[in-house]
Every structure is written in C-alpha cells, then in structure tokens.
C-alpha cells in the first residue's frame, strides 16, 4: 500500500481524499505548503515528498496540528497531543500550538494531564474528577495559579489526593 508523504497529507486535509492527490497540486499550493511548513521551524519545508512514517513523533504532531488547522475549524480539539513526546519536543509542540491557536484565533479545547501546560496555556482551566467538573478557573486567578496551588485546590474540591505522579511531575 502506498505511504502518504507530507504533501499528500496536506492535500488530504484540504480536499478530504486520500488517493490521487498530487496530480492536482499547483505551484502556488506547493509554495503555500512550503511556507506553512517553514513556519513550524522543523525543516519540513524542503521535504514535501518525505513519507510521513519516517518523521519523528514531534514532526508528525506538528504536521497533524498544521493539517487540522488548514481549514480554520470552528473548534480545535487536542486530546493529550504531547503525551507521547519527550519533554523537549513536547515543549516545542506546545509553543507551536500556542502560536497557531493565537494567530488563527482558534477556539481550542485541550485535554492534558500536564499541570504546567494546563496552567500556562489557554484562558480557562477546567478540572474533572470522576466525570464531574470540580474546578473552573479563569482570568486573574488562573494567571496567578501554580502547580502546588492547583493540587491543593483539587484536594479541597475532590476530597482526594491527586494520584497521577506523571501529571504532578510534568
């Protein structure tokens, strides 16, 4: 089975198809994809025909984010989109995410267990426990929040200790 390259992925995101995509690519579209990929800062702009399967995890996540935002969605859903990445790559993908969301003025729902990311990014933090909203923090209160503060508020609101060491240590 034919593996998709970066160009095919970008076209599939735009056209909603998988096969026979590259024949309809104009020079202007190729240049647009190069510019968009160049904005990621990952050296992908010169690799339009590179198979996606050969990219690093961070490159794939950044490409996926770019594809998801090509058509300016009404709502961008990000579900643990940095969870499988090493800390340095995760930080780079989060910076890219923040830039793309801000520049595109995209309404975004990001699900994460990373407390620092939950505090640092976005304008509202909602914490769930056992399927219920136990914290909803925004504005100045969120800006002043620290991980220890968040853990303390979680304990008070839920009556439980936070049990996910990975999230605490993130």
Q: Model segments located where?
A:
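Conserved ABC nucleotide-binding domain
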Residues: 36-53
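ABC ATPase C-loop
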Residues: 68-69
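Catalytic Walker B motif of ABC-type/P-loop ATPase nucleotide-binding domains
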Residues: 76-79
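Helix N-cap at the start of a conserved alpha-helix in ABC-type nucleotide-binding domains
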Residues: 87-89
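Helical segment within the ABC ATPase nucleotide-binding domain
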Residues: 91-103
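H-loop/switch region of ABC-family ATPase nucleotide-binding domains
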Residues: 112-113
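Conserved beta-strand-loop-alpha-helix hinge in the C-terminal portion
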Residues: 132-158
């Amino acid at each position: 089975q034919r593996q998709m390259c970066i160009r095919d992925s970008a076209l599939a995101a735009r056209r909603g198809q998988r096969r026979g995509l590259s024949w309809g690519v104009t020079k202007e579209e190729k240049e647009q994809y190069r510019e968009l990929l160049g904005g990621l800062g990952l050296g992908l702009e010169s690799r339009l025909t590179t198979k996606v399967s050969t990219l690093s995890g961070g490159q794939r996540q950044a490409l996926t984010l770019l594809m998801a935002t090509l058509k300016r969605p009404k709502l961008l859903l990000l579900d643990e989109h940095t969870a499988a990445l090493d800390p340095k790559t995760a930080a780079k993908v989060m910076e890219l995410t923040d830039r793309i969301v801000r520049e595109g003025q995209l309404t975004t729902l990001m699900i994460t267990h990373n407390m620092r990311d939950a505090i640092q990014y976005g304008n509202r933090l909602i914490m769930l426990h056992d399927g219920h909203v136990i914290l909803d923090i925004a504005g100045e209160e969120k800006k002043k929040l620290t991980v220890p503060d968040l853990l303390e508020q979680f304990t008070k609101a839920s009556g439980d200790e936070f049990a996910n060491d990975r999230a605490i240590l993130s």
